[in-house]
Amino acid sequence: MSEEDSDSVITDSQAEEEGELPVIQLCGLVEELSYGNSALKTETEMFEKYYSRLEPRDHRMTRLSDIKITAAEFSQLRSRRKSKARGGLDRTLGLTVEQKLELVQKELEDTRDEIRHMRANAERDLQHHEAIIEEADIRWNEVQKAVHEFEKDILKTISKKKGSILATQKVMKYIEDMNRRRDNIKDKLCLKNVSLKVQRKKMLSQLRQKEEVGEALHDVDFQQLKIENAQFLETIEARNKELIQLKLASGNTLQVLNTYKNKLHRAMEIYVNLDKEILLRNELLGKIEKETIQAEEDRAKAHILNDKLRKQLAEFRAPQVMMYVKEKILNGELEKTIKMWERKVEIAEMSLKGYRKAWNKMKTSDEQLQIIRPPGK
């Protein structure tokens, strides 16, 4: 009897007992049966998968076509199963425990192979993405380097000569040089790609020849290759870790370099300020030296004048007392004479003024007489 017959017997017997069981027991029975059905469904799917691997597709299609029967035959078969169930027959066809264990082990091996294959694909995708990220980092560094070179070689030189023909020519020359450099890199990469394709064709032809000769790889070779692949993967992982550490060290080095650059920039600013201050101090020192020289010259002149005055003072001799008295008396007489002549001058001026007044009166009277006197007398 097949599994369908056993299921029909169980369902019929359960259907007869359903009228006698309470609702709580029925719910528990339904839950237990649903759990058992899920386990049986999983087991059936595993068996079908294994059966689909073993049986060819054409034979499987014919077997499925043989299953198609009419509704009448199906009803007769169902009634026959019920009668057999009522008769107490409980023959079921199924797999033994050893066969089930073999199927489970085979399914476990297939699952492990799938996991290994998925892991290899994931590692390959991870390496591919890491290569893309590394290529992007290299490209970004190249772009930053190109920008830095452009700013250093072009922008700083043409910023002082805006609008000039020389600046435009320099920019065009820089663009032409960059295009020529990219063309050279493209040619090199094309040649490298062609050589790699040739090597790939050679390796494929060698592998094809080995397969034709019968030197194809066996299980032992595959195991050896798996071991070598695992070793290479460990080496690649170690190198990737080392690369990550180097990248971290490079990042730290860049941070330290930026810090030292900032310190150098500040030191250069301080150096420029100190240079300016030194120039100002030198100018002030030059002025002070000039003033010092002028003060030395003035001091030398004052010293010479002082020596001269001291010499004159040393050579000075005071006159005698009688001579001084005589000179003083003579000076007093001269002052008296001067005062006397000053009085005489004042008297003469006053008499001159009187004479002028009298002269003016006489002159005016004479003019009046000439005006009054008639002509001809």
UniProtKB/Swiss-Prot annotation:
GO terms (BP aspect): cilium assembly
Keywords from the named record: Cell projection, Cilium biogenesis/degradation, Coiled coil, Cytoplasm, Cytoskeleton
Coiled coil: 95-139, 169-355
Domain of life: Eukaryota
Cellular component terms (Gene Ontology): centriolar satellite; ciliary basal body; cytoplasm; protein-containing complex
Primary localization class, coarse: cytoplasm
Record carries keyword Nucleotidyltransferase: no
UniProt subcellular location: Cytoplasm, Cytoskeleton, Microtubule organizing center, Centrosome, Centriolar satellite; Cell projection, Cilium
Membership in a protein family: Belongs to the CFAP263 family.
Function: Component of centriolar satellites contributing to primary cilium formation. In complex with CFAP263, acts as a regulator of ciliary beating that connects radial spoke 3 (RS3) to the inner dynein arm (IDA) and the nexin-dynein regulatory complex (N-DRC). The complex is positioned parallel to N-DRC and forms a connection between the arch at the base of RS3, the IDA tail and N-DRC.
Subunit comment: Forms a complex with CFAP184; the interaction is required for functional activity in cilia. Interacts with HAP1 and PCM1.
Designated name of the protein: Cilia- and flagella-associated protein 263
Organism: Mus musculus (Mouse)
